[in-house]
């Protein structure tokens, strides 16, 4: 029988179209009415099976909470010890960035919080993160990372999350239960440029919020209405917010913030991360042991959830890249969920892959595990944890580069009293 051949050009074209999820045949749309879709047999192995880890040494920094790629070789990170730094993934070099202070920096006395969020605007010309005061919003210009301004008169508690809703407007979500809308005007930007030209010392403006809205508190304990995570739907100009009382809130977010709805989440413990999949029109919400997929246009009983099988450690980070949802856990695991096939990647990996396999509902799923990192054997460790030989590093943050072939992963030990760090490049 004649052998069927495929030209190398066609093979190359097909391979170039695959992201980290690889090729899975024809793409199916998400069925919003019943949340069911045909399970697709993979026809090509996902790229994530071939990822290998290279750890970075971060010295004595404590727990990396946030990260974003700046370009093909630099990642900016924020830590629990309130350090903002850039790591060069080719050389491993660490460069610390000065953090921005309030008008009255002497009033800041909040240890143990740090930088929980870093976000780039759509044009990648501005970066928003926390300031020296964890209640304040700091804006830097890219690619230089020159300071632009600080929003220091809004929140009364730590900023947990940030989302850009346009090139000049960002929203911050705080532990005080409020969401602040901030605008970086042309006037602020031009004055920032002129100040840098006149001064060799970093100078920056102080801005006030354009709007400050509290999330609804009528159905729950007001003390637990902390805004933990934000994600923006640019197509509909809608902002999703998750609060620690187990609710999802949706806001219209353009020139101001207008509440659209609030709904109780099916799994409402430790809802600390949120991502939006534009192609799928769903929000992914992480909880103690589940990832829930929420379409605000559908009834709440249509919410689909999948279990990570790592109970107790929590889902600490979640992201969309094409049809693959990457899940970082408190046990130091990276799991990969195929939203088209509606299952975790579970085919037997090739011999050359770097990863472990874990049982899930009778089948095997791919689980990549973070490396050893660094742990401070301080007094807390000696008094309470010295008999435990190994602590997994919680995946507090992860992000793909623009090509989808490099995955930066960072975090640290899960117990709040332990001091340590982990950062690695999987490629």
UniProtKB/Swiss-Prot annotation:
First and last residues of every WD repeat: 110-150, 154-192, 222-261, 310-347
From the UniProt record, give the pathway where this protein acts: Protein modification; protein ubiquitination
Record GO terms (molecular function): ubiquitin-like ligase-substrate adaptor activity
Please, one GO biological process term?
A: ubiquitin-dependent protein catabolic process via the C-end degron rule pathway
Q: Which GO terms describe its cellular component?
A: centrosome; Cul4-RING E3 ubiquitin ligase complex; cytoplasm; nucleus
Q: Which UniProt keywords apply?
A: Cytoplasm, Cytoskeleton, Nucleus, Repeat, Ubl conjugation pathway, WD repeat
Q: What job does this protein perform?
A: Substrate-recognition component of a DCX (DDB1-CUL4-X-box) E3 ubiquitin-protein ligase complex of the DesCEND (destruction via C-end degrons) pathway, which recognizes a C-degron located at the extreme C terminus of target proteins, leading to their ubiquitination and degradation. The C-degron recognized by the DesCEND pathway is usually a motif of less than ten residues and can be present in full-length proteins, truncated proteins or proteolytically cleaved forms.
Q: How does it assemble?
A: Component of the DCX(DCAF12) E3 ubiquitin ligase complex, at least composed of CUL4 (CUL4A or CUL4B), DDB1, DCAF12 and RBX1.
The name this protein goes by in its record: DDB1- and CUL4-associated factor 12
């Amino acid at each position: 029988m004649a052998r069927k051949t495929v030209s190398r050009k066609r093979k190359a074209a097909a391979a170039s179209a695959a992201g980290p999820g690889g090729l899975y045949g024809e793409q199916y749309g998400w069925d919003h009415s019943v949340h069911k879709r045909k399970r697709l047999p993979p026809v090509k192995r996902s790229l994530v099976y071939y990822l290998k880890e290279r750890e970075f040494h971060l010295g004595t920094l404590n727990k990396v909470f946030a990260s974003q790629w700046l370009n093909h070789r630099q990642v900016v990170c924020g830590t629990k010890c309130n350090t903002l730094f850039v790591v060069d993934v080719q050389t491993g070099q660490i460069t610390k960035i000065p953090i921005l202070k309030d008008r009255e920096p002497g009033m800041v006395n909040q240890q143990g919080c740090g930088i929980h969020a870093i976000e780039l605007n759509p044009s990648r010309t501005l970066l928003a993160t926390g300031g020296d005061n964890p209640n304040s919003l700091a804006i830097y210009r890219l690619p230089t990372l020159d300071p632009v301004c600080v929003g220091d008169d809004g929140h009364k508690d730590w900023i947990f999350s940030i989302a850009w809703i346009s090139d000049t407007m960002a929203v911050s979500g705080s532990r005080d239960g409020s969401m602040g809308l901030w605008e970086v005007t042309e006037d602020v930007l031009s004055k920032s440029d002129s100040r840098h030209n006149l001064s060799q010392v970093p100078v920056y403006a102080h801005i006030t919020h354009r709007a400050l809205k509290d999330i609804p508190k009528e159905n729950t304990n007001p003390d637990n209405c902390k805004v933990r995570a934000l994600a923006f739907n640019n197509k509909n100009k809608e902002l999703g917010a998750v609060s620690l009382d187990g609710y999802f809130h949706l806001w219209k977010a353009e020139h101001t913030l207008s509440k659209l709805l609030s709904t109780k989440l099916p799994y409402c413990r430790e809802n600390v991360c949120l991502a939006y999949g534009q192609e799928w029109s769903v929000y992914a919400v992480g909880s103690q042991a589940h990832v829930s997929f929420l379409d605000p246009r559908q009834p709440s009983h249509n919410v689909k959830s999948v279990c990570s099988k790592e109970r107790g450690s929590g889902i600490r980070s979640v992201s969309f890249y094409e049809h693959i949802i990457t899940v970082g856990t408190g046990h130091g695991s990276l799991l990969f969920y195929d939203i088209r096939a509606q299952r975790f990647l579970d085919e037997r990996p090739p011999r050359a892959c770097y990863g472990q396999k874990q049982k899930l509902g009778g089948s095997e799923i791919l689980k990549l595990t973070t490396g050893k990192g660094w742990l401070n054997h301080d007094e807390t460790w000696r008094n309470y944890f010295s008999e435990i030989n190994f602590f997994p590093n919680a995946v507090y943050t992860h992000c793909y580069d623009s090509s989808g072939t490099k995955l930066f992963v960072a975090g640290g030990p899960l117990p709040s009293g332990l001091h340590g760090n982990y950062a690695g490049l999987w490629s």
